[in-house]
Amino acid sequence: MDDDIAALVVDNGSGMCKAGFAGDDAPRAVFPSIVGRPRHQGVMVGMGQKDSYVGDEAQSKRCILTLKYPIERGIVTNWDDMEKIWHHTFYNELRVAPEEHPVLLTEAPLNPKANREKMTQIMFETFNTPAMYVAIQAVLSLYASGRTTGIVMDSGDGVTHTVPIYEGYALPHAILRLDLAGRDLTDYLMKILTERGYSFTTTAEREIVRDIKEKLCYVALDFEQEMATAASSSSLEKSYELPDGQVITIGNERFRCPEALFQPSFLGMESCGIHETTFNSIMKCDVDIRKDLYANTVLSGGTTMYPGIADRMQKEITALAPSTMKIKIIAPPERKYSVWIGGSILASLSTFQQMWISKQEYDESGPSIVHRKCF
């Protein structure tokens, strides 16, 4: 497909928005899902201050703005701001006219019906798209790994889901949601670094901690043993240079932070860890398909990028599952963007072209058409 008629693929996450053209192997635009508004009235006349900023620009001006995330825990909660993010995506990032391209959007598993209708309505009425489709994020990740059956553990910035999928269809009764993801881990790292005597409190400093987390954290195969190693030697210590030139040292925090994924009690949460949630999700499925799910457990999303996470999942699920069961954890290197990549694959398939909801169908049926055509 040429760019001039290529479908647009937009994956709206709680933390980052990924956008680009169907058929590409990576998103062209990746920016924070943030809308910022000035805290104070502009002092300098003629500076041409805008009433709102989106993405990286909002991030860089964060000291004078109030930042809002329109997507909370994977679900859109502020539609005015969401519209601003889409506008920014089309006109500033991709530089396309949305009325000339079909648009594939992604949604969280178990997204409320009213939300899908609202997305559909905004695309056709505000942006005048010729056609659109809404796909479930985890299903796209599975497609990106070249499968149609498996269980996806998708963990991003705002929310974690375990989604069993059989022959391309998500099984809603067995989907589980865990409100523990990247943002919570960043907050936890801020807290445990404070215990070491480093103070990180502001939203600007939170971004620094997020960078420390992404560069230095990893998942221990055996937490207790790793703690013992960290206590007895400095072999696990790493240093990090802050923007002001100060150098900080971080030791057991490197694996204590992501350990919260397996032990949510670290964050004061009573829920099960990601390994147990994945197991519970499999157990909610028909006994005949469990074997296929165990053998096709796919990790996706930025919060699954920690080194060591796949080995640890393998170990934990093996301990929970029947002893003869073959368990395979698939962690593709590009899993940070696998939702987007799956969307790019889907939207460029010739067999998918009849699946689009067209403007004409929308005009005839209204927003509820989305439930009949996207499942």
Curated annotation (Swiss-Prot):
The modification N-acetylaspartate is found at residue 2. The keyword Transmembrane helix does not apply. ISGylated. It comes from the Eukaryota. Its EC number is 3.6.4.-. It catalyses: ATP + H2O = ADP + phosphate + H(+). GO terms for cellular component: actin cytoskeleton; cytoskeleton; dense body; focal adhesion; nucleus; plasma membrane; protein-containing complex. Keywords: Acetylation, ATP-binding, Cytoplasm, Cytoskeleton, Hydrolase, Methylation, Nucleotide-binding, Nucleus, Oxidation, Ubl conjugation. Gene3D superfamilies: 3.30.420.40, Actin, Chain A, domain 4. It is found in: Cytoplasm, Cytoskeleton; Nucleus. Its main location: cytoplasm. The keyword Transmembrane helix does not apply. In vertebrates 3 main groups of actin isoforms, alpha, beta and gamma have been identified. The alpha actins are found in muscle tissues and are a major constituent of the contractile apparatus. The beta and gamma actins coexist in most cell types as components of the cytoskeleton and as mediators of internal cell motility. PANTHER family: ACTIN. Belongs to the actin family. This is Actin, cytoplasmic 1. It comes from Camelus dromedarius (Dromedary). The gene is ACTB.
